Amino acid sequence: MMFKVKVYKRSSFIDKRGYYWTSWKKGLIKNLEFKHDKFSLSKKNVLRGLHGDKKTWKLISCPYGKFFLVVVNCIKNSKDYLKWKSYVLSHKNGLQVLVPPNYANGHYCLSNECLFYYKLAYKGKYADVDQQFSLRWDDPKLNIEWPLQKSKKIDKAKLSYIYPKPILSKRDR
């Protein structure tokens, strides 16, 4: 796969008191000027995305909790068009994922709560919701293997675990 997504490990210090980490240091990524940051707090089983736009770079990290991140290549002429990769980000592993323009991303909260933090770099004005594209989280063409939490209930007719539906926004349904 020719994904342009890059993974970084931020410096951090963890001990019995908690943790301390650096989210960004100038010069880490050349030729990108981050213009603003966003946070999203989610509860367990919340699934957000998949969204993207044509001009924004996103540096994604998890300062609290743990989430499953999916990144999808949406470049139509690419041999990896609609191919996806996944990453588990947490405050303990310190991973950061740089998502380029024309890629969609979405995440699923694995812990009781998780904080999705991202820095945005783009030219011109910010591409707000009306300039973004969305993909269905459960699109069969993508066949994303979301780690939906298994319920302890068993569907005896199907002899399989029942997966609770993820909690979605109106935009993501």
Model features per residue range: what roles?
Residues 1-92, 113, 120-173:
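Non-catalytic, conserved peripheral segments adjacent to functional cores
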Residues 93-95, 103, 114:
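Surface-exposed loop/turn positions
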Residues 97, 105-110:
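Short beta-strand His + acidic residue motifs that chelate non-heme Fe in jelly-roll/DSBH
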